[in-house]
């Protein structure tokens, strides 16, 4: 009887598409002392694999991070229970690959076809190839660049502390390479988009439309085609009461008087504090989501430019990403955690579905894994990027800064992170580096 109590009946199953990883679904007894490693040994034995494959395990949709005994105890179950245990291939550690050096803090990143675009505190947008060579530089912003996004293989958009967005042409015979750049700063600006009254800190693109989030509490809605937007007179738009500083800023941006200036299609107003991020809904281009320092998540109808839902939390929200297949929004906060929300839930329903805990400072950027709908990565002012599987409340891996000059709490803040297929997990911050960590083919064979 003592031996029976030290075992529990387990029924293994998997959703892996590779049928060579499927075991018979007959239940068997397993020692309650087993953790992931011991359970992985059982699966490998049942499969008879020549090369062992590490596995992770889930019970009731949650990753197992303790022994079976601890799980039974936490759930108030006896060892007579039958546990349905799902197994899935374990994830490779996001090992360090390389870094690119930038002139100043790296504040924004995006990944396109075989290229990376970065925004920096020196006001310059740069495109890089995957070998680390700067292909082009785009000068024009008069303050830090806070957001960048590829529109297509030939165009991109940026937003910055100078309160403007800029549409750029990335391929143009008139655009010279870095070593020939002098004197061509404005040659490849398609249009300057004006209308915000404070820094522009986030942009998103879907089709021919752009969204921008600003510290003026508003969201800008723009077109990727300058012909769709109303022209702005560069000086008249300032008004007679404009400060001398504002007029000076405007003169600095008027080196090329022929640069088009355009007004937004609309400004979306409802937030009561700076808007930190705005994104298009993945399944509906007429819907957008935003998060703000006013503690709220808002849903917008872009056809009517109206806020149609507001969900209030207890903390400033600083970043957001959608998990499309799960229909959830992950939000990074000033309270150092990541919260998961269902934007479809009724306002009277539970606001927060789940919390991911582990960061020690603001969570300022998020992105999803291109290979797994349950996984995401987060960047924080605590100097780390964390990798998460939302089926566990704690992170799977923590990525630290690799540059030797980094001092904890001095110059280690991470401002931007992207997770892209064929590239990996890339991050940028105060260390003036774009750091690459393995994030492609993440499952062990």
From Swiss-Prot:
One of its GO terms (cellular component) is nucleoplasm. CDD domains: WD40. One of its GO terms (biological process) is maturation of LSU-rRNA from tricistronic rRNA transcript (SSU-rRNA, 5.8S rRNA, LSU-rRNA). InterPro entries: G-protein_beta_WD-40_rep, NLE, WD40/YVTN_repeat-like_dom_sf, WD40_repeat_CS, WD40_repeat_dom_sf, WD40_rpt, WDR12/Ytm1. Gene3D superfamilies: YVTN repeat-like/Quinoprotein amine dehydrogenase. WD repeats lie at residues 101-138, 140-178, 195-232, 270-310, 312-351, 358-398, 409-445. GO terms for molecular function: ribonucleoprotein complex binding. It is found in: Nucleus, Nucleolus; Nucleus, Nucleoplasm. Component of the NOP7 complex, composed of ERB1, NOP7 and YTM1. The complex is held together by ERB1, which interacts with NOP7 via its N-terminal domain and with YTM1 via a high-affinity interaction between the seven-bladed beta-propeller domains of the 2 proteins. The NOP7 complex associates with the 66S pre-ribosome. Interacts (via UBL domain) with MDN1 (via VWFA/MIDAS domain). Component of the NOP7 complex, which is required for maturation of the 25S and 5.8S ribosomal RNAs and formation of the 60S ribosome. This is Ribosome biogenesis protein YTM1.
């Amino acid at each position: 009887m003592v031996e029976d109590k030290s075992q529990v009946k387990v029924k293994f199953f998997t959703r892996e598409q590779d049928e060579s990883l499927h075991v018979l679904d007959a239940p068997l007894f397993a020692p309650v002392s087993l953790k992931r490693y011991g359970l992985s040994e059982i699966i490998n034995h049942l499969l008879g694999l020549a090369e062992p494959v590490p596995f992770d395990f889930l019970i009731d949709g949650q990753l197992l991070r303790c022994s079976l005994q601890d799980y039974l105890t936490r759930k108030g179950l006896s060892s007579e229970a039958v546990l349905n245990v799902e197994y899935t291939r374990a994830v490779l550690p996001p090992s360090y690959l390389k870094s690119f050096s930038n002139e100043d803090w790296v504040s924004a990143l995006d990944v396109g076809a075989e290229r990376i675009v970065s925004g920096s505190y020196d006001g310059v947008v740069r495109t890089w190839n995957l070998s680390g060579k700067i292909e082009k530089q785009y000068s024009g912003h008069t303050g830090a660049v806070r957001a960048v996004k590829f529109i297509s293989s030939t165009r991109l958009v940026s937003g910055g502390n100078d309160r403007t967005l800029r549409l750029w042409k990335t391929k143009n015979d008139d655009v010279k390479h870095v070593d020939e750049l002098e004197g061509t700063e404005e040659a490849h600006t398609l249009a300057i988009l004006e209308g915000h009254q404070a820094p522009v800190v986030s942009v998103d693109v879907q089709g021919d439309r752009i969204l921008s989030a600003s510290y003026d509490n508003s969201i800008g809605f723009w077109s990727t085609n300058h012909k769709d937007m109303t022209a702005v007179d560069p000086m008249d738009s300032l008004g007679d009461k404009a400060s001398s500083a504002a007029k000076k800023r405007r003169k600095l941006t008027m080196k090329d008087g022929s640069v088009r200036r355009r007004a937004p299609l609309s400004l979306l107003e409802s937030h009561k504090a700076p808007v930190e991020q705005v994104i298009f809904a993945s399944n509906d281009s007429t819907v957008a989501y935003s998060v703000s320092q006013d503690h709220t998540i808002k849903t917008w109808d872009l056809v009517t430019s109206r806020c149609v839902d507001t969900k209030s939390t207890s903390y400033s929200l600083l970043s957001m990403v959608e998990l499309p297949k799960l229909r959830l929004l992950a939000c990074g906060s000033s309270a150092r955690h990541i919260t998961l929300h269902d934007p479809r839930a009724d306002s009277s329903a539970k606001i927060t579905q789940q919390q991911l805990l582990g960061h020690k400072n603001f969570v300022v950027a998020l992105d999803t894994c291109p290979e797994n709908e349950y996984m995401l990565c987060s960047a924080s002012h605590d100097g780390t990027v964390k990798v998460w599987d939302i089926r566990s409340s704690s992170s799977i891996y923590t990525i630290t800064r690799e540059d030797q000059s980094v001092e904890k709490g001095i110059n280690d803040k991470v401002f931007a992170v992207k997770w892209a297929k064929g590239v990996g997990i890339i991050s940028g911050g105060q260390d003036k580096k774009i750091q690459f960590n393995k994030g492609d083919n993440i499952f062990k064979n």
